[in-house]
Amino acid sequence: MSDPRTAPAAVTPAGAAPGAPLLDVDGLNVRLPIDGIHRPVLREVSFSLRPGEAFGLVGESGSGKSMTARAIDRLLPAGAQVTGSIQFDGQDVSALTGAGLRQYRGRVAMIFQDPRAHTNPVRRIGDFMTEALRTNMSVPAAEARARAVDMLGQVGIEDGERRLRQYPHQLSGGMLQRVMIATALLTQPRLLLADEPTTALDVTTQAEVMAILDDLRREFGLTMLFITHDLELAAAICDRTAVMYAGQIVEIRRSSLLHDDPLHPYTAALAGARPDIAQTAHRLRAIPGRPLSAFEAPQEECAFAPRCPHARDVCLAAVPDLLETGDGLSRCVRTHELRGKLQAVADA
């Protein structure tokens, strides 16, 4: 099988040694207990992030994006069966326990898509923000609060002392998400896992929050795994992007190429389904069928074949490997012959 970790990146950050990723996910498989049976939710997921790189995970709901992030952060539900390898800075994440796991979580921060679902309504903002500093890094309470006030200022929240005394319900959705970003950055992480951080916000607030997140990521030199269902947003934010479908990665390449020159029929269909405000009376293009979860998808053939207009008998013969294309990776046995046609689909 081709190694997704060799896929080209748009940039090699200064000081990053080629072949020395900060995060290396290799052959990750996750099965969860569903209706009394362990069913697959991730299948052979492999990718790596170089220091300072922004890497996107794109796909529809249920494709496995968030589950991948939770596996990296060791936040999978009880009873999960995990195989494969997750290496962070050369350490086996699955082997970490106790103090080692707490230290790891200080170096890997996560921003969730719904801030209200991940804050305690009866705890003040200050307690929430400083908890990781106090418990994982043994920072004194007064110093932790001072750092929190400073970080609130960096995400555009004034009067930080007053905000620390408030409760989550006293803040707007956009302001609370800024608090989540500030909290994630307080421990000076090396890796930021951003799980659709603007989904619950209105369009204007989304743009403001994304600008803050991208600016601070660049300022602090963070590596970021950015999860989204929006192909255009990934192209604007990320150096490289992996497209996921039914628990598998189906394409990895430079983000700027995903729309104009897709390698996989699913990527082309996603790009073609986007609304175009420049066209009037334009019927939205929908992908036939419905998105499948990993345990619903065919196990012995291409998972996208039931919805793919380009599927042939060869697509039903086996689960395709991620194939090298010279400028990326694609899980489609017809990539080379379809390339021009897929570009037309994306542009339609």
Residue ranges and their predicted role:
Residues 74, 193, 197-282:
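P-loop NTP-binding/switch modules centered on Walker-like glycine-rich loops
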Residues 186-190:
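A short, proline-enriched helix->beta-strand linker immediately N-terminal to the Walker B motif
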